[in-house]
Amino acid sequence: MMQDLRLILIIVGAIAIIALLVHGFWTSRKERSSMFRDRPLKRMKSKRDDDSYDEDVEDDEGVGEVRVHRVNHAPANAQEHEAARPSPQHQYQPPYASAQPRQPVQQPPEAQVPPQHAPRPAQPVQQPVQQPAYQPQPEQPLQQPVSPQVASAPQPVHSAPQPAQQAFQPAEPVAAPQPEPVAEPAPVMDKPKRKEAVIIMNVAAHHGSELNGELLLNSIQQAGFIFGDMNIYHRHLSPDGSGPALFSLANMVKPGTFDPEMKDFTTPGVTIFMQVPSYGDELQNFKLMLQSAQHIADEVGGVVLDDQRRMMTPQKLREYQDIIREVKDANA
């Protein structure tokens, strides 16, 4: 029991101490905030007092100045000296708008040229302060400069539109450029498909040499060619010479014919050609024609050339195949 009671007292004491600390912190912060709140009010109040004091001083000086101008009829030199006295007063610019009516003081030097009317230009300065009703005379010189300004103002206004019209008149005859008619592009005509073609290959000897006739004859016969019409060789559908001719072989030298007894015969090369369309599948016939040309070139030691007698390339072979397809589509 004693231990529990002691523990309770310790807890209660700790809570009380914390509460006192919190209360003290809160009161000190509250007093500090109240001090900061009072400072701006005091500053504003002191500033207003100073401003009101300055206004009273200025009003007193203005009243005294009016009394001096009424009583004193001194010469023009003395009056000019007195009229120059307010200038240091206007060097100070108070923060309030109540001192703005004293700005017209700059106008009196213009009206002080005649000596008799010297005191009058100083009076309009004091009219907005004390006696605007008792001195109507300064109002007349103010109205006189206003009337010429109003009359002179419309003159540039009426003359302004004239140059504008003159500048606008030369622009009237200018006609807007008309868009030129755009020529429509001519319709692109599709290239007419060819309905027939001739595929040509050449088997030629190397540069500066010729093919042997006996060796050439044996290679031609091994490739399935048979001597026939027009004294040239033909490759038929069947190797024994039966069936329609698929492609033919002629001499590269004019007139292009051969002699079956050409043991002592030599030539720079031979030409293999195929007419499209032909019997059967033209693409298969083209492959057989290419194989025959390669076989003859290998046997005689020559090379395969295209229709321009240039080295045969894969691009040229694809071109031949495209021509064959085009002819087939045109005749389909």
From Swiss-Prot:
Where this protein primarily resides, as one coarse class?
membrane
Pfam families xrefs? ZipA_C (PF04354)
Where on the tree of life does the source sit, at the highest rank?
A: Bacteria
Q: Does the keyword Ribonucleoprotein apply?
A: no
Could you list which ranges are Cytoplasmic topological domains? 28-332
User: Where is the chain membrane-spanning?
Assistant: 7-27
Periplasmic face residues: 1-6
Give the residue ranges for region: Disordered.
42-190
Q: Name one GO biological process term.
A: FtsZ-dependent cytokinesis
Q: Which UniProt keywords apply?
A: Cell cycle, Cell division, Cell inner membrane, Cell membrane, Membrane, Transmembrane, Transmembrane helix
> What is stated as this protein's family in its record?
Belongs to the ZipA family.
Per UniProt, subunit arrangement is:
Interacts with FtsZ via their C-terminal domains.
Q: What does this protein do?
A: Essential cell division protein that stabilizes the FtsZ protofilaments by cross-linking them and that serves as a cytoplasmic membrane anchor for the Z ring. Also required for the recruitment to the septal ring of downstream cell division proteins.
Put simply, this protein is called Cell division protein ZipA
Which organism's genome codes for this protein? Escherichia coli O1:K1 / APEC
